[in-house]
Amino acid sequence: MYIHKSVLLNEAIEVLNIKPDGIYVDATTGGGGHSSHILSKLTTGHLYCFDQDEYAYTRSKEVLDPISKENYTFIKSNFVNIKSELNKLGVEKIDGILYDLGVSSFQFDIPERGFSYNYDAPLDMRMNQSQELTAEIIVNRWSFNDLMRIFTRYGEDPFSKQIARAIEREREKRRIHTTFELVDVIKSALPAKVLSKKGHPAKQIFQALRIAVNDELRVFEVSINDALEMLNSKGRAVVITFHSLEDRICKTVFKERSTIDIPKGVPIVNLEAPYELITKKPIVAKEEELLENNRAHSAKMRIIEKK
């Protein structure tokens, strides 16, 4: 059994303002950490749990069924489909939604999933294991320009060009199949002073590949906008991000929804934005959690409420 510690668990549950009869969505169910706490607070309400990962379904069911089999529904789908999947079930409005955008520990810790540079495994990185696109396909088939683009945009790696060029040269000789093979290629493109720095030299490239394989940024932007439209009055969206790219999208969307940009000279008064930011600055983990859970160091939580 792989143990996944939910980040900012107590804080997220508190700011959701859970009503016992409310309708809630956990967009990223994973091992059921957040879901179990939401479900335990419901009486006549209902929780809809989204996750496209087969293991997440099995793991969360073990956690949630003992609490209540009647008060939750697991929807095995990417959260980009939140609106359409809920509409199929006759759900048009919700009282709260939670996104925990970090990769679950079990996904990192199962070597064959290929998410981690710490294990030698096939280059996979798919959240949905039924989709065709894998990290191996990207590494071996995408053009130099496309590799450099995703390494720069999604990995923000200053050596994106050099790494993309090294991959291009390597695959002329042989196909790159595994995580360790890719790590070796990445290291070959970096100067000694970078290799001697703290932190793994492949971290940003692996992040870029994971985002590209799963189309994570576009999917989140579509999903959060759909979710905000579904919120009831006083309903809240709570988002936990783990890197600057996701946080930037969240911050931008929340700002757009909570402000009204009226051109100068336009005689409009008393016009209110339909949403309110609950926190001006993101909530971060307390010292105690940082000591217990390494994943918490990069976590930021933002909250918005429908007026």
Regions found by a protein language model. Name each.
Residues M1-K307:
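S-adenosyl-L-methionine-dependent methyltransferase catalytic core, i.e., the SAM/SAH-binding region
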